[in-house]
Amino acid sequence: MKRLLTVALGFLVSVGLWGQTAFEEIAQQPSKAGGIYHMYPESGFSRPTPAPKGYKPFYISNYGRHVARFNSSNSMYDRFDQMMQKAHDDNALTEKGEDFYRRYHAQYPYCINRGGDLTEKGANQHRGIAKRMFTNYPSVFKGRGRIDARSTNVPRCILSMDYFCDQLKRLNPKLEIEKTVTRDDMAFLNPHSLVNPSVTPTDEGYNNKYAYWQDNYKAMCRENTNPEAFFSRLFKDWNYVKNFTDDPMKLEIDFYYLACSNQCLDYEESYWDLFTQEEINLLWEADSYRFFCSKGPDDIQGGRQWAFCKTLAEDFVKGAEKDIEEGRCARLRFGHDIAIMSFMTLMNIDGWSTPAPTPHDAKDLWQDYNVQMGANIQFVFYKNRKGDIIVRFMNNEEDVLFPIESAIAPYYDWAALKAYMEERIAVAEKIIATTQAPPKK
């Protein structure tokens, strides 16, 4: 009983249920304001919960998000340089604006044509995750263990797979790792792509312009931004920015994304000083709400988006069965944040699956910074001498509890966990069959 209480208390701490609000978390750890650009920690992980007596780990199945990268938009970097250079030449900048101009002008050459590229910080993130996995589960990666590694066909994910697998090979050169990159795997590695036969063009991606939730998201953006106040600190006349955009609100949000993504770069520069703390909080809230609506438990679309992730759930189940039968020691997958968001919601994990009564309630129920650069989910399989199999599930290397009974939580009987996952897959199939893709507007 004492052990179960310890696990439960650890889980409560890990999901922030001691009354701390999201804004308080951001004040305590400012990098969380970066949302999905939040950096994966290098240390501070809980010690693995001891397995029941007689059980040893023998197989791992994971899904890892790519690690730290540049902002995905090359054009954003270019537009900022062109705008600030012109404003400087026109003597249109305030003292604070000139300071930003000097700092950004120095950074810009480092960013040219690097949109979406991984950084060395990112490479080190996956080396660290791989090393901890190897160290925590040496019995999995012993001898000539065979590993199946797969990535989406996006370069940053392929490189993430390489960094991870290369680290494992350095730790045990005998490992036999087969790496695969094929469009066919996108159906489960990127469940919101058109390779998934359930997805239509108006369902595709994470920010589809036809999505049912876009109106709610845009309304929050209008409420949470103040372009006049923000740009008045940078430009002598804030209306000057209208020479470069017909949507000052979006430009303010782009400044926020620049600040978010800069923490991922090897180039040391921060732009959070451009914002007040209230602006940071509100901009983060709107961005997190976008993902909450798109791939989280917002009920405006009836669960359709997270239901697409049934393909990943199916691959976890079928892949584990296949690998255990054929003697592999691990199956490693590398992809994107939205798959992890959707999977956690699909599995009805506490802290990931609660709808918000109002848009502004979402921020304290669900936070996008929990799917930071390098975010991951891991199923670790254990067995005893009789061949009984139990599984522990982790999100970002911390134990997570499934909503099913287990006297040995955070460990679960594999047959029971598989049955639960198949139930959730059936729920997802019903949702997809009974909901409609958004119409083209």
Labelled PLM ranges:
Residues M1-A22:
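Bacterial Sec-dependent N-terminal signal peptides
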Residues Q20-R146, T152-R331, G335-K441:
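Signature for phosphate-centric chemistry
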